[in-house]
Amino acid sequence: KNVRRVIGLSMAGLSGEFPAALEKWTFDNLPISYVQGERQARNVLRESNLNYTILRLTWLYNDPENTNYELIPEGVQFNDAQVTREAVVKAIFDILHVDDETPFHRASIGIGEPGTHYDKPSFH
């Protein structure tokens, strides 16, 4: 009833922002029904009147020691092939605690691990 903000998680690559090799690998390794569901969920938020932030995640893996992340604005090529779940949690915490929410208001932001510009995640 008094929802002030929604953080939605979605997959990266739905807007053609991945390099060709990473995009091909991603879509070759996910069921089309999953990709369609991700698009539909993203569109529900975009068509709402909510203050939302959609976080576009690349391939996830676990590493409690690695919380490195970078934020990639929508419309910018997203080169990072992977990011840790721990880094995503840190990014969400950081976004929720910024003084100025303006960059995140009704925005779609990619989260990736710096320096992981691979054709597929390193763990595959």
Give the positions of each predicted feature.
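Glycine/proline-rich active-site loop of Rossmann-fold NAD(P)-dependent oxidoreductases
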Residues: 18, 63-71, 96-106
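A short, structure-level motif marking secondary-structure boundaries and short turns
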Residues: 25-28, 77, 121
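A conserved pocket-lining segment of Rossmann-fold NAD(P)-dependent short-chain dehydrogenase/reductase
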Residues: 69-83
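Mid/C-terminal beta-alpha module of Rossmann-like enzyme folds, strongest
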Residues: 79-124
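N-terminal plastid-targeting presequences
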Residues: 1-2, 25-27, 69, 97-98, ...
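Conserved SDR Rossmann-fold cofactor-binding beta-strand/turn motif
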Residues: 56-61
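Conserved Rossmann-fold NAD(P)-dependent oxidoreductase catalytic core, especially the SDR/UDP-sugar
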Residues: 1-37, 42-47, 53
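Conserved beta-strand scaffold positions in the cores of enzyme catalytic domains, especially
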Residues: 52-54, 108
